[in-house]
């Protein structure tokens, strides 16, 4: 049905519309009135303000209810009733409780305890199984982990292989990491992944032998370099693997989502899981580096495997904090990941996976338990057809309508929507960026939907006032259809951009998350075609006015039923328009508005809301990480609200006065709440990052350094008892991108090595200093002693070294020229890495708590150097909050290990959580000249 200026006669009295020429009597008399059922249908589906208001309210309820249901863990996941699965879940839950008893980072004794626990559990599960085998991966690797950064890692991954009946099939890898960060119990990251692996292992151990070999990698030290996965790449078992499923946690509970997949050929099999939950919107975010954290998926993909990344993704404000504990998760979260892992692994391990789609990115999503996926080539084809087809169909129809049906479209009618969009976007940008963002910048962390709802209300009011104003001054025959056509054109342009991007899709410029625009364009364009077809097959306005016909349509549009609460306004609008135009239009457009509304608004609203909510819910907490993230989130809030409004814009003229009043009240209330609500609370805390540093070049004094967003946490530090008692000043320094580092000299020295003075935490012995070799190279050799330590980093700040050596036992190393580029190992077992472009950082990770680091390096002095020495900054990290955990003679009170950290955790407000800044909670550094 055309816009309100077209006017369905259900809102106009009989004598206004159908007076006969002579006697002025009504066309219908009381004896010709339709029955109650027909009246009700006309009242509901007639183009009246009350009818539209009902539709809008139902649409909002439908959109929010379905989206909440689809994303709700408790409503969509059923706990198992099968006996075996129930036992597996109970066992995995107990495993999770044991794994997450203490923080268990790579640099902690609790990490060893978790390793030993897993080893014991694996042996219990696979014992007496003839086709399974266990291997404790002891690989040592030395490799370039980033540009000019070389990493050494000693692995203690736990590997299990379930040999398949068909050795010709490439194996399936299931992987998760068992280390946590120092500040977290690691329940979600990645305890649930490990517990799920144990559950899947038990499933296979108690069922028939699979066709395909399945390998489990319970890997270590993922958090600070993906080291466990990288070490496994060098293991002999890795060569037989073709596919993988990586289990991860970058949030803290909720539903496990399919983050990304290597290709369509493997992603499509996610439809075999019982509770699919997925969207390639997150894949696009990862591939375009909007999400900065990485998972082991990266290592496996770069090694040539095909697979999936299944992970928990929210909330990120308790991710890597002590709040990632067993109290804050749901048994159903574990079952969601575990059951989907069982289903996927069971299917892939017993089916032959072909190469179809292995070279194509996948576009995918899920809704209400159904999984949909497509190769991008198919989506490009569909989009291309739509881009070409709809102009071909709509162009002639529009020409016929304007040329022969006398549909007059004035300049003001044509420009009203573009001008309204420009005006609304401009006002909203000012309100949001200069108002909300300045008044309460971190509110998206706790109330993102309040910002979206308020912004949407303000935008709708602006559209309502502007578009109705233009329509009053310059009425159109069918402004609704004009608006639908113009929105279709907007989507058409967006679809061209999306299709071009998909046709050249690549990492760094990924468009796989933009698939919703295909559906949005199809719905809007189809509705525009219906409207144009209605005009095309109607009589022209001129014909209608000349034939003298007073006959109403069989639909009975001349009747008027329903409440009068809005009809007076509509009658006034009728009096404002030409009578013949109104009469003609109402005859030919009785109830098509409802068809157009139902075609466009409910589905479009649901797609936009659900997609927008998933994105916001996934990244809103990252507002605490940088100013760039803050700007991105506020931009997304505005885009979310503007796109959510688009489907309703063709009908905005008909909004009921009560809904307009409600929007006004809501907008005012929203602005007030945004101004006064606290951005952080116990459920949505502020996350701060901690490290305690000792620089032995200056003194044995320790300094607490805390990192967070600028200007919001210095008062918390100043309120610490030790700070107030010693009258210590908290000093803050602005960092880039809206961050701030605050520090203070701590009276609470670290005690991670009981009985040791801080000066004994790091000692460096220079074994060989500036020994001149051939080709003008200099070489040096040092031994680093760091008790109870697993992690150190060497920084070559002034000169890059050309080669590094991790000595095994012998000092004998081949001549520099004979050493191959990259990694090598000499006959004495020494690990060597050579890079003539230069190495400026060497990262060391070892398993033996008290073994020294024995390091050698070669460098080339600068021509203008007066002294041929190399400056080396040695920094070692300790991460153990409870060194006594795991046994040994070093048991101590956990509260005494890092008392400065414990003080902050204990005395901070309940709306603050704490995470580690570096790989440890304590670092001790020493600078030497070699």
UniProtKB/Swiss-Prot annotation:
Q: Which residue intervals are topologically Cytoplasmic?
A: 1-49, 401-411, 471-480, 536-598, 653-657
Name the Gene Ontology biological process terms: proteolysis
Positions of glycan attachment: 163, 354, 620, 697, 768, 808, 890
SUPFAM superfamilies cross-referenced by the UniProt entry: Zn-dependent exopeptidases
Q: Which InterPro entries match?
A: Fxna-like_M28_dom (IPR048024), M28_fam (IPR045175), Peptidase_M28 (IPR007484), PFF1_C (IPR053975), PFF1_TM (IPR053976)
Family the UniProt entry places it in: Belongs to the peptidase M28 family.
- State the name under which the record lists this protein: Vacuolar membrane protease
């Amino acid at each position: 049905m055309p816009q309100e200026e077209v006017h369905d006669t259900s809102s106009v009295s009989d004598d206004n519309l159908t007076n006969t020429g002579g006697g002025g009597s009504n066309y219908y008399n009381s004896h010709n009135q339709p029955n109650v059922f027909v009246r009700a249908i006309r009242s509901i589906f007639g183009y009246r303000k009350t009818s539209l208001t009902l539709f809008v309210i139902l649409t909002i309820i439908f959109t929010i209810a379905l989206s909440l249901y689809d994303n709700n863990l408790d409503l969509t996941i059923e706990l198992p009733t099968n006996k075996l699965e129930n036992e597996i879940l109970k066992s995995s839950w107990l495993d999770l409780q044991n794994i997450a008893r203490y923080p268990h980072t790579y640099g902690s004794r609790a990490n060893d305890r978790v390793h030993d626990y897993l080893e014991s559990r694996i042996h219990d599960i696979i014992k007496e199984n003839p086709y399974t085998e266990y291997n404790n991966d002891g690989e040592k690797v030395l490799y370039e982990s980033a540009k000019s950064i070389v990493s050494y890692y000693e692995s203690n991954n736990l590997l299990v292989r379930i040999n398949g009946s068909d050795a010709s099939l490439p194996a399936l890898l299931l992987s998760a990491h068992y280390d946590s960060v120092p500040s977290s119990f690691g329940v979600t990251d990645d305890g649930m992944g490990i517990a799920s692996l144990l559950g899947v292992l038990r499933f296979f151990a108690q069922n028939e032998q699979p066709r395909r070999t399945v390998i489990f990698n319970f890997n270590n030290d993922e958090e600070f370099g993906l080291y466990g996965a990288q070490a496994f790449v060098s293991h002999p078992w890795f060569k037989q693997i073709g596919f993988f499923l990586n289990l991860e946690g970058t949030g803290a509970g909720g539903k496990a989502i399919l983050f990304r997949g290597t290709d369509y050929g493997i992603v499509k099999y996610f439809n075999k899981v019982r509770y699919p939950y997925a969207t390639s919107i997150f894949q696009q975010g990862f591939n375009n580096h909007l999400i900065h954290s990485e998972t082991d998926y990266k290592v496996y993909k770069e090694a040539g495997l095909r697979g999936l990344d299944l992970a928990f993704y929210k909330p990120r404000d308790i991710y890597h904090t002590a709040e990632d504990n067993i109290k804050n998760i749901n048994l159903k979260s574990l079952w969601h990941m575990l059951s989907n892992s069982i289903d996927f692994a069971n299917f892939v391990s017993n089916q032959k996976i072909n190469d179809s789609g292995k070279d194509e990115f996948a576009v995918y999503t899920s809704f209400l338990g159904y999984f949909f996926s497509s190769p991008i080539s198919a989506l490009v084809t569909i989009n291309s057809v739509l881009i070409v087809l709809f102009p071909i169909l709509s162009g002639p129809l529009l020409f016929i309508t304007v040329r022969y049906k006398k549909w007059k479209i004035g300049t003001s009618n044509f420009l009203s929507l573009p001008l309204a969009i420009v005006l609304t976007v401009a006002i909203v940008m000012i309100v949001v960026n200069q108002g909300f963002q300045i008044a309460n910048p971190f509110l998206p962390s706790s109330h993102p939907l309040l910002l979206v709802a308020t912004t949407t209300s303000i935008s709708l009011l602006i559209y309502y006032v502007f578009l109705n104003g233009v329509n009053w001054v310059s009425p159109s025959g069918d402004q609704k259809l004009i608006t639908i056509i113009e929105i279709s054109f907007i989507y058409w342009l967006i679809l061209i951009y999306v299709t071009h991007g998909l046709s050249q899709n690549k990492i760094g410029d990924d468009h796989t998350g933009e698939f919703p625009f295909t559906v949005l364009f199809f719905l809007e364009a189809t509705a525009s075609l219906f409207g144009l077809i209605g005009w095309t097959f109607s009589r022209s306005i001129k014909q209608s006015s000349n034939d003298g016909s007073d006959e109403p349509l069989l639909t009975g549009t001349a009747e008027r039923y329903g409440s009068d609460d809005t009809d007076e306004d509509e009658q006034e609008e009728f009096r404002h328009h030409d009578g013949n135009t109104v009469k003609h239009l109402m005859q030919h457009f009785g109830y098509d508005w409802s068809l157009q509304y139902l075609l466009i608004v409910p589905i479009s609203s649901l797609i936009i809301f659900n997609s927008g909510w998933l994105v916001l819910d996934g990244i809103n907490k990252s507002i605490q990480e940088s100013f760039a993230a803050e700007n991105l989130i506020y931009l997304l809030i505005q885009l979310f609200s503007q796109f959510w409004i688009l489907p309703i814009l063709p009908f905005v003229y008909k909004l009921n006065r009560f809904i307009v009043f409600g929007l006004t009240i809501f907008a005012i209330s929203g602005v007030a709440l945004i101004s006064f609500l606290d951005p952080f609370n116990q459920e949505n805390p502020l996350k701060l990052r901690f490290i305690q540093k000792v620089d032995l070049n200056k003194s044995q004094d320790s300094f607490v350094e805390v990192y967070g967003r600028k200007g919001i946490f210095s008062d918390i530090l100043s309120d610490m008892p030790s700070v107030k008692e010693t009258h210590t000043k908290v000093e803050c320094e602005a960092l880039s991108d809206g961050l701030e580092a605050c520090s203070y000299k701590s009276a609470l020295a670290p005690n991670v090595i009981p009985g040791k003075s801080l000066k004994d935490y790091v000692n460096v012995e220079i074994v060989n200093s500036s020994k001149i070799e051939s080709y003008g190279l200099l070489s040096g050799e040092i031994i680093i002693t760091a008790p109870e330590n697993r992690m150190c980093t060497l920084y070559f700040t002034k000169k890059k070294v050309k080669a590094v050596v991790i000595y095994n036992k012998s000092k004998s190393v081949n001549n520099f020229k004979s050493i191959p580029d990259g990694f090598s190992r000499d006959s004495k077992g020494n690990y060597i890495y050579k890079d003539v472009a230069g190495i400026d950082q060497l990262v060391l990770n070892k398993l033996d708590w008290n073994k020294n680091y024995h390091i050698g390096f070669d460098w080339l002095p600068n021509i203008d150097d007066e002294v041929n020495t190399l400056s080396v900054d040695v920094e070692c990290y300790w991460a153990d909050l409870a060194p006594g955990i795991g046994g040994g003679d070093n048991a101590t009170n956990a509260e005494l290990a890092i008392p400065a950290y414990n003080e902050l955790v204990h005395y901070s407000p309940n709306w603050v959580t704490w995470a580690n800044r570096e790989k440890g909670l304590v670092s001790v550094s020493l600078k030497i000249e070699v």
